[in-house]
């Protein structure tokens, strides 16, 4: 560790002692011995210099001198680029600053920003940079023949196309496309186009346009008011007019439905619902329909049998015929009982009436025989 420096108060005190000791000495500025004595006193007061610090300082000065010498040698090889007409020099990076040799600082007319190249002209996404490689304006005949020969097989294997590369579109949409972008599909060897077709609108741009249009679009209330303002003056709407209009619309609707149903009925294309609405009496439940059919059939059979019995009873006057008819009636009744044990009240009444008639017919021959 370097020695600690003495406080300023101690230094001032020692200097005062040196002045006191040298005060009044004769020939202070002439005698060499006196000057040596004074010098020894001053050295005793001043702190001793650190040898390591002095050596480090000397080494640093030597390195700085050597570096400056090298810079002077390499400075000859560095040259500033030529500035085209109409171009701002601040848009061009200083070559001396790039090599760490520019001594002008902020006064330099060139830019000292290492990112100035990235901030320069943006790449054109509507043109393919590979199209410039095929410029043959400066080719001679020999070069042209070599290129044709080398490209003959390559062209057949990798024919150019107008299809836009999907990786290029993805990079443009994600804002990753730039001078340093490389296509994952082979870089410059990709045979798809790396340029947008004329008039192509990106999805992000389309979204911004839609948002702008939606912001300019009027609200629904404003549109309604504008449309109402465009309407011409007409009859004022009243409840009576509204009810009349409603009745008219209902009548028109009913007429249209009736016409359509009539047309469908004419073509036998009516649905079950339409048939039910037109005539509901045609439809009954399945169980009730079966019972009603059986009841009607039994009534018809009973009436027909009663008529037949009356006709037979009027023509025959013998008791044998009456007994035979009564047996037939009994057999028919048994058959009816077998067919259907449960008879309605109407059927029972009719059966009782027919039996009473047959009993009367049976009694009449007996009365005649007794007389």
UniProtKB/Swiss-Prot annotation:
SUPFAM superfamilies, per the entry: CCCH zinc finger
Mitochondrion in keyword set: no
Alphabetized UniProt keyword annotations: Coiled coil, DNA-binding, Metal-binding, Repeat, Zinc, Zinc-finger
Biased amino acid composition, Acidic residues: 330-352
Segments of skewed composition (Basic and acidic residues): 10-23, 292-312
Gene Ontology annotations for the cellular component aspect, listed alphabetically: mitochondrion
Zinc finger (C3H1-type): 88-115, 159-197
Gene3D superfamilies per record: 6.20.400.10, Zinc finger, CCCH-type
UniProt entry tagged with the keyword Coiled coil: yes
Source species, domain of life: Eukaryota
PROSITE patterns xref list: ZF_C3H1
Disordered: annotated segments: 1-64, 290-371
Coiled-coil boundaries: 205-237, 283-317
Comp. bias (Polar residues): 34-46
Record-linked PANTHER family: ZINC FINGER CCCH DOMAIN-CONTAINING PROTEIN 21 (PTHR12681:SF16), ZINC FINGER-CONTAINING PROTEIN P48ZNF (PTHR12681)
Name of protein: Zinc finger CCCH domain-containing protein 21
Species whose genome carries this gene: Arabidopsis thaliana (Mouse-ear cress)
């Amino acid at each position: 560790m370097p020695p600690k420096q003495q406080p300023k108060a101690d230094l001032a005190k020692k200097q005062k002692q040196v002045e006191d000791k040298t005060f009044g000495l004769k020939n202070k500025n002439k005698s060499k011995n006196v000057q040596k004595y004074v010098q020894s006193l001053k050295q005793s007061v001043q702190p001793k210099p650190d040898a390591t610090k002095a050596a480090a300082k000397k080494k640093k000065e030597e390195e700085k001198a050597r570096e400056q010498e090298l810079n002077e040698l390499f400075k000859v090889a560095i040259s500033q680029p030529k500035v085209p007409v109409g171009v701002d020099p601040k848009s061009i990076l200083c070559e001396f600053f790039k090599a760490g040799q520019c001594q002008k600082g902020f006064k330099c007319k060139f830019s000292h920003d290492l990112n100035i190249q990235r901030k320069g002209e943006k790449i054109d996404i509507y043109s393919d940079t590979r199209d410039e490689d095929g410029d043959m304006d400066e080719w001679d005949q020999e070069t042209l023949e070599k290129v044709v020969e080398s490209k003959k097989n390559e062209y057949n294997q990798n024919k150019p196309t107008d299809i836009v590369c999907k990786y290029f579109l993805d990079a443009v949409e994600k804002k990753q496309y730039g001078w340093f972008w490389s296509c994952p599909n082979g870089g410059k060897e990709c045979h798809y186009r790396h340029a947008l077709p004329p008039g192509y609108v990106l999805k992000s741009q389309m979204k911004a346009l839609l948002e702008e249009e939606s912001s300019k679009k009027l609200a629904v209330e404003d549109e309604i008011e504008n449309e109402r303002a465009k309407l011409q003056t007409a009859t004022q709407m009243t409840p009576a007019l509204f009810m009349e209009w409603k009745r008219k619309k209902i009548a028109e609707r009913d007429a249209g439905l009736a016409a359509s149903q009539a047309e469908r009925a004419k073509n036998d294309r009516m649905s079950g619902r339409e048939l039910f609405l037109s005539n509901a009496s045609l439809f009954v439940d399945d169980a009730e329909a079966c019972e009603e059919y059986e009841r009607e059939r039994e009534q018809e059979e009973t009436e027909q049998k009663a008529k037949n019995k009356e006709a037979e009873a009027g023509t025959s006057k013998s008791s044998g015929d009456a007994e035979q008819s009564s047996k037939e009636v009994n057999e028919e009744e048994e058959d009816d009982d077998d067919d259907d044990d449960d008879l309605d009240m109407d059927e029972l009444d009719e059966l009782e009436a027919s039996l009473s008639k047959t009993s009367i017919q049976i009694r009449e021959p007996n009365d005649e025989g007794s007389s």
